[in-house]
């Protein structure tokens, strides 16, 4: 399940790294966090062998959770957007199939290429670009993160990208990649601002993002669905950037960045007087609180991967979205 490229990442800002003090020299920073000397040194986030093992362990845990419809079985191997999407999916599955997943097919991730950035401090992260036995010919891009040496690598992002669309990354002579800071100004949109700009674009349009399936086409589809006989659908989009949802970016060979980021979306369906909201499927019902009478509000978490050039429009290459909750009224 391996082959390599190089990696980078930021995340879980609220935690100070807790490292065993056995013969290790420690010092206190102004913030009160304990810092291990050498932590500020620029180092590869992981070895290629560690990255391959992290991918293997994630796949094993994911398959166990999917087979049993039990979110606790892969909770230690997911975080951020992927954890929000995956745990909700498993919760709905368990509600409808308490004996487990009758359609379980083990996920197989092969032809893995690892892009591992060199960076200082925590969190550290890397990208696995893989082929899967699901999702057609799309490449599965997973971003793994961790906040300390004793912590488990967790998958924070999972996006699917069409073959040939994954860019070449800038690497040093040893094959290690370069992490792009969240506040970088040498790209069209600083990675920290992509989630806000994307959600603003979905509401108002604009020229920041290139036309495509996840931009102009999605806006057109939502506009088409907003008003139908007896039913009005409203859309609200919000950025999601803090903690485990922080964006992560890799420098591309042409000077731009490949950015992974998260957003939150709400869809409210309201039925006209004397009519009712169409009955949703069982998975939606399993995640919905309250009785659906005149309206249904659904909350989704979406993780995106975008090509953020040094100059020009941002291209959203892939997006995976999942329902996380619902409310009937």
From Swiss-Prot:
Q: How does it sit in the membrane?
A: Lipid-anchor
List, alphabetically, the GO terms of the cellular component aspect.
plasma membrane
Residues annotated as transmembrane: none
| Keywords, in A-Z order | Cell membrane, Lipoprotein, Membrane, Palmitate, Signal
- Please tell me where this protein is predominantly located: membrane
Q: Which domain of life is it from?
A: Bacteria
Keyword Heme in record: no
Lipidation feature positions (S-diacylglycerol cysteine): 33
Where is the signal peptide, in residue numbers? 1-32
Q: Could you tell me where this protein is found in the cell?
A: Cell membrane
Lipidation sites (N-palmitoyl cysteine):
33
The protein in question is named Uncharacterized lipoprotein SCO2278
Its source organism is Streptomyces coelicolor (strain ATCC BAA-471 / A3(2) / M145)
